[in-house]
Amino acid sequence: MNLINIFPDPSKLIDIENTNKIVLFIFLKITDISIKKNIKNDFFKENINILHWFDCQYTNIGKEDFWSDALIIEFKNKNNLQEIYKSEIGRINVEAIQVFNIFPKNLPRLFVNFLKLFRPIGFFFEMIKSTKKELQNLKNSDSNILPTKIQAERLLNEKSTKKAYMINLLELKEMAQYKDKSISITGREAYVEKYGKQAFKSVILLGGDFAFNGRIIGDSLIEHNAPLDTQGKWQAIGIAEYTKPRKMLELEKIPGYSKGLIHRDAGLKRNYNLYATKNT
């Protein structure tokens, strides 16, 4: 393992995006549990604001199970990050690390809570429809946006009773690619506007929520021993919360979701999806 400062040099940040609070998303690979405990204790002593800390379980979309932890940390401003960067607090032994600078884009809670009022409808469709349909079109072959059948079956058979958090890294196509060549819209319009809104509603109706949504600013600030699955440039991160892991594969039970998949496929270039639980 290597002693690495997991906090980036503030000079690497894009100034126009970081006039106030700075939010970092950090992937870590740590196999020594004692190191993880020490990090958490040190961060607590220094009043570092950890918005979320996730224990990574396994990869749903991607080639390998790799990361052990995922953190979202907020700093008051660039000066606050500068102080922490210069201190020894961030220098830890890690096998791998990847850090992104993100701009939060969370939806208003008032709107989310309004959608939750319609959950009984979602529970009804969940009861009357089978999950088997969701596996029919999955294959054990390479895909940048779908799990393999083996990965999906692992998720369906997951016995954990903890809430499941699905961490998504997203890269969109510049222009959406439909079979109907007369459709000319951007990848963002296809994925976010046409697919994303329906997916969001479906997650909420199935009893879920969204722990975090944000736009990734620039390239990775730190990338050491990162796997091919997460290397490179990403545009957004979304973390969906489900009452149980298998719920991610039951979204098609909600009316309207299946019709939106054509827009997901047209607009999404690459997706990394990781199943995680909350570190408490």
Model regions and ranges:
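Accessory, usually C-terminal, subdomains that scaffold auxiliary metal cofactors
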Residues: 243-250, 254-263
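Residue-level marker of structural boundaries
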Residues: 90, 256-257, 269
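Charge-dense polyanion-binding interfaces
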Residues: 262-280
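Short S/T/G/P-rich N-terminal loop/turn motif that feeds into the first structured element of a domain
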Residues: 1-235, 247, 277-280
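Active-site scaffold segments
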Residues: 236-241
